[in-house]
Design a protein with these regions (language model features):
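Sec-dependent signal peptide cleavage junction
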Residues: 17-54
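Residues that define the transmembrane beta-barrel architecture of outer-membrane proteins
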Residues: 51-53, 74-80, 142-148, 208-212, ...
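Predominantly the C-terminal beta-signal and adjacent terminal strand-loop region
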Residues: 198-255
């Protein structure tokens, strides 16, 4: 009996030692922590070599919307514009930029055996067909404007806009600098030359002194198509035909 008790006590003692050794070798379980995914870095653009379309040259076809049937035009009416602009890329998205500048815009409309009395002492502008009497072989109306264009631009590759598609919408506000008619080569009703000379008459009396023109450009690199439509009338209300000039053409940009 004593032997049984001694054997049992020995077994319990050994088990106790083994349990203590096992507990001391166990490592605490650390709670798993899921690391947050790193935030995607915003792409940085290098604009140090970016051309900003500071200088714009435009040539285009000019016309009059709402032109009366009694006004006969001919030839290739045209516009010439030149602007210097400052370009400011958006820090939040360099694809976009805003541009503002100044320049000069000119329109030249050619007429077929017509007379515009812009200098006549009349209450309204005289516009008449002179094909059945003496007239000028070549006759045109030219206007020149000092303008301030503003554009919102988008470039598909802001680091290399000279090799990228681009879009621009904007508006330009202009003040009239000069308006004149120019006639060349005086003829009779049979279109026979009577005398070769040039007559130029200048007056701004019948013209609106301010014009507002929404604009649009789209193209690639340094060449873009442009369109412009004057929402203000060319002549003062009630003093001349209710025409609104428009232009479609090409823009060459640089710097």
């Amino acid at each position: 009996m004593k032997k049984v008790i001694l054997v049992a006590a020995a077994v319990l003692f050994v088990c106790s030692l083994y349990a203590q050794q096992t507990d001391s070798t166990l490592k605490p379980v650390q709670p798993s922590v899921t690391e947050a995914a790193p935030k995607k870095k915003k792409k940085q653009f290098d604009l140090s070599n970016r051309s900003n379309d500071h200088f714009l040259l435009q040539i285009g076809y000019a016309g009059w919307n709402n032109q009366p049937d009694t006004i006969n035009t001919k030839g290739l009416p045209r516009s010439f514009n030149a602007y210097f602009m400052l370009d400011f890329p958006f820090k939040s998205n360099p694809h976009f930029s805003a541009a503002i500048g100044a320049g000069v815009g000119t329109d030249h409309i050619f007429f077929n055996k017509m007379y515009l009395g812009i200098k006549d002492p009349t209450t309204t502008l005289t516009v008449k067909d002179v094909s059945d009497t003496t007239h000028f072989k070549k006759y045109k109306l030219a206007t020149a404007w000092l303008e301030a264009p503003i554009e919102l631009r988008y470039s598909f590759d802001p680091e290399n806009p000279g090799k990228s598609w681009k879009i621009a919408i904007g508006v330009k506000v202009g003040t009239l600098l000069n308006a004149h008619t120019k006639g060349k080569t005086w003829q009779n009703s049979q279109n026979q030359t009577l005398i070769s000379y040039i007559q130029k008459e200048s007056s701004k009396r019948f013209f609106n002194s301010t014009r507002i023109v929404p604009t649009f450009r789209f193209g690639y690199g340094h060449v873009t198509l442009f369109g412009a439509y004057q929402i203000t009338t060319l002549f003062k209300e009630g003093l001349g035909p209710d025409v609104r000039p428009y232009t479609i053409g090409l823009t060459l940009s640089g710097l």
